[in-house]
């Protein structure tokens, strides 16, 4: 009797497994892609684990077309025409479970990880106005102060010495966001290069783990179990920099709660104080909003900005004609009295045509985030070209792949050519701009987009006007991807220009 029950149980398990395997295999059977992707997500895990998933994804789309099956239930789309469908301004396409790995199981959702549209709106709506250009005066002050600190460090170096421009850009981006959030900079610019690099790379060490885990529901669940075990055993797996940031945020919240000082948002206060003031006047805001947003600003904001600046500098140094064009534009505006030194004002650089073209080209070629932004197909299903995706299918678009889509950006889409943004018609320019999802799209556009743009547009001209820079080894620049890009090998020789104060 027992053996009969065991046999029935085994048959039931096998039948269930066979059903699910067949369902996984056949529900997207008409969509092209690697055979192994039809039956397992392990190929996706391996692609991200290789740190070259952006290149692999791009090759897969070159081989199979605009719509490619990446996993049993995951489809990647390359055609920018699908952006407004997959990432609409209205609700409908929820974020997938991919985003679970970016927070601990016991942490509440933030504006990035929230899947529920209602929670996302509650978290985002009250704070969004603080990220508009008109509200970022305190950010410009932080940028100016940190450019001065960066120049002080660079001026002290002997002319002709090799220096890692990547590390300086990362340190600047981190200190600037830190000062914007908490008034005083962290001090990354004053650290020695070895200590500085080690501290800055703590985020990358985390993403090397959670990047691959994000590609498989089984591994995501395993990550939660591992985290629970580590917590139970009191094993610390959180980088010191992250812990220090959390501690400072908590301390600032406690100080604000106990303070009797009257403040208002029009005072010269840092971003965290503005957020705390906003929260104190709105009882509907979840209690964790300020702390979660502050962490996002510090870590996601600084890393992503540094990647874009690194991409810009690498290509400007590699293509000296582009750098000369940008330099000439700056000198021309300076001669007209519309650009000041040593640090140009935001109002002076926000509309420079060639600077805009270089920034757009950097955002297009190497966006900071290079995995598909996953969404869940709603109950209505989704038709993409000749293909139908049933409800529950995961669908996503990678900023890296979309930004190199040749029917929109040209047959030279893999090449650096800022002039593509200047030579085209206004209609084609709008089409290219709407075809980039570097900062997301629809209802989920990144809050920090304007923060990054202001930092980049002020720092790049300031450095170029002050220093003559030469790339020491054009072949040494390397990029890796595990959700965020990581760059290294941007070693340069910097010489202060004659007449620079």
Curated annotation (Swiss-Prot):
The lineage of its organism: Eukaryota, Fungi, Dikarya, Ascomycota, Pezizomycotina. The keyword Iron applies. The chain crosses the membrane at residues 5-22. It comes from Penicillium shearii. This is Cytochrome P450 monooxygenase esdpH. It is an enzyme of class 1 (oxidoreductase). The gene is esdpH. It holds the Pfam family p450. Keywords: Heme, Iron, Membrane, Metal-binding, Monooxygenase, Oxidoreductase, Transmembrane, Transmembrane helix. It is a single-pass membrane protein.
């Amino acid at each position: 009797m027992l053996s009969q029950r065991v046999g029935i149980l085994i048959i039931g398990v096998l039948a269930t497994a066979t059903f699910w395997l067949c369902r996984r295999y056949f529900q997207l059977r008409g969509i092209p892609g690697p055979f192994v992707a039809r039956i397992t997500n392990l190929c996706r895990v391996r692609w991200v684990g290789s740190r070259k998933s952006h290149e692999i994804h791009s090759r897969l789309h070159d081989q199979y077309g605009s719509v490619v099956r990446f996993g049993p239930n995951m489809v990647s789309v390359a055609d920018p025409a699908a952006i407004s469908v997959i990432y609409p301004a209205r609700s409908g396409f929820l974020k997938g479970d991919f985003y679970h790995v970016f927070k601990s199981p016991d942490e509440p959702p933030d504006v990035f990880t929230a899947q529920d549209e209602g929670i996302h709106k509650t978290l985002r709506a009250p704070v969004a106005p603080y990220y508009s250009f008109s509200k970022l005066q305190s950010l410009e002050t932080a940028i100016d102060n940190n450019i001065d600190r960066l120049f002080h460090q660079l001026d002290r170096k002997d002319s002709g010495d090799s220096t890692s421009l990547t590390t300086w850009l990362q340190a600047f981006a981190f200190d600037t966001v830190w000062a914007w959030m908490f008034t005083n900079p962290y001090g990354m610019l004053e650290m020695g290069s070895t200590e500085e690099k080690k501290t800055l790379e703590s985020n990358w060490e985390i993403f090397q783990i959670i990047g691959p885990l994000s590609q498989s529901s089984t591994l995501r669940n395993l990550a939660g179990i591992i985290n629970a075990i580590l917590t139970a055993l009191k094993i610390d797996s959180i980088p010191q920099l992250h812990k220090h940031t959390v501690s400072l945020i908590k301390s600032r919240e406690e100080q604000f709660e106990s303070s009797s000082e009257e403040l208002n948002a029009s005072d010269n206060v840092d971003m965290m104080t503005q957020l705390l003031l906003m929260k104190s006047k709105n009882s509907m805001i979840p209690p964790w909003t300020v702390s979660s947003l502050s962490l996002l600003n510090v870590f996601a904001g600084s890393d992503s900005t540094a990647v874009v600046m690194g991409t810009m500098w690498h290509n400007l140094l590699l293509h000296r004609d582009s750098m000369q064009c940008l330099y000439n534009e700056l000198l021309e505006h300076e001669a007209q009295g519309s650009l000041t030194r040593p640090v140009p004002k935001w109002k002076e650089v926000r509309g420079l045509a060639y600077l805009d073209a270089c920034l757009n080209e950097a955002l297009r070629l190497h966006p900071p985030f290079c995995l598909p932004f996953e969404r869940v197909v709603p109950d209505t299903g989704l038709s993409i070209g000749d293909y139908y995706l049933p409800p529950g299918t995961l669908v996503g678009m990678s900023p890296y792949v979309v930004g190199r889509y040749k029917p929109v950006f040209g047959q030279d889409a893999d090449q650096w050519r800022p002039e593509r943004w200047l030579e085209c018609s206004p209609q084609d320019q709008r089409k290219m701009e709407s075809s980039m999802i570097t900062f997301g799209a629809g209802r989920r556009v990144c809050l920090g987009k304007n923060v990054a743009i202001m930092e980049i547009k002020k720092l790049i001209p300031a450095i170029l006007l002050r220093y003559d820079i030469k790339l020491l080894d054009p072949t040494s620049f390397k990029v890796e991807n595990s959700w965020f890009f990581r760059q290294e090998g941007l070693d340069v020789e910097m010489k202060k220009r004659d007449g620079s104060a």
